[in-house]
């Protein structure tokens, strides 16, 4: 067993769309340093995630876990809803 097999990769992000059936779009923000000036810049990545029970709404803060590919673009599953939208 290698070191990466024992732990499931997880990320936290905000739900930006839930219009699809059992699928949510999650925006994951990260900060990167500008190569020349050193200022930290926000970068956003959008990923599709599987929401089996359609329980997420727009604005929720969620945790995603990596999984086997479910479709062409979807390889994440909903782990937990950390914070509900107001």
UniProtKB/Swiss-Prot annotation:
<comment type="similarity">
    <text>Belongs to the universal ribosomal protein uS17 family.</text>
</comment>
<dbReference type="GO" id="GO:0022627">
    <property type="term" value="C:cytosolic small ribosomal subunit"/>
</dbReference>
<comment type="function">
    <text>One of the primary rRNA binding proteins, it binds specifically to the 5'-end of 16S ribosomal RNA.</text>
</comment>
<dbReference type="InterPro" id="IPR012340">
    <property type="entry name" value="NA-bd_OB-fold"/>
</dbReference>
<keyword id="KW-0694">RNA-binding</keyword>
<dbReference type="GO" id="GO:0006412">
    <property type="term" value="P:translation"/>
</dbReference>
<keyword id="KW-0699">rRNA-binding</keyword>
<dbReference type="Pfam" id="PF00366">
    <property type="entry name" value="Ribosomal_S17"/>
</dbReference>
<keyword id="KW-0689">Ribosomal protein</keyword>
<keyword id="KW-0687">Ribonucleoprotein</keyword>
<dbReference type="GO" id="GO:0019843">
    <property type="term" value="F:rRNA binding"/>
</dbReference>
<dbReference type="InterPro" id="IPR019984">
    <property type="entry name" value="Ribosomal_uS17_bact/chlr"/>
</dbReference>
<dbReference type="InterPro" id="IPR000266">
    <property type="entry name" value="Ribosomal_uS17"/>
</dbReference>
<protein>
    <recommendedName>
        <fullName>Small ribosomal subunit protein uS17</fullName>
    </recommendedName>
</protein>
<comment type="subunit">
    <text>Part of the 30S ribosomal subunit.</text>
</comment>
<dbReference type="GO" id="GO:0003735">
    <property type="term" value="F:structural constituent of ribosome"/>
</dbReference>
């Amino acid at each position: 067993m290698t070191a990466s097999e024992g732990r499931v990769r997880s990320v936290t992000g905000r739900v930006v769309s839930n219009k699809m059936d059992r699928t949510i779009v999650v925006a994951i923000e990260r900060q990167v340093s500008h190569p020349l000036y050193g200022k930290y810049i926000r970068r956003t990545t959008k990923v599709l995630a599987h929401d089996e029970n359609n329980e997420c709404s727009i604005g929720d803060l969620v945790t995603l876990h990596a999984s086997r590919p479910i479709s062409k673009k979807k390889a994440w599953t909903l782990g937990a809803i950390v914070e509900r939208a107001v």
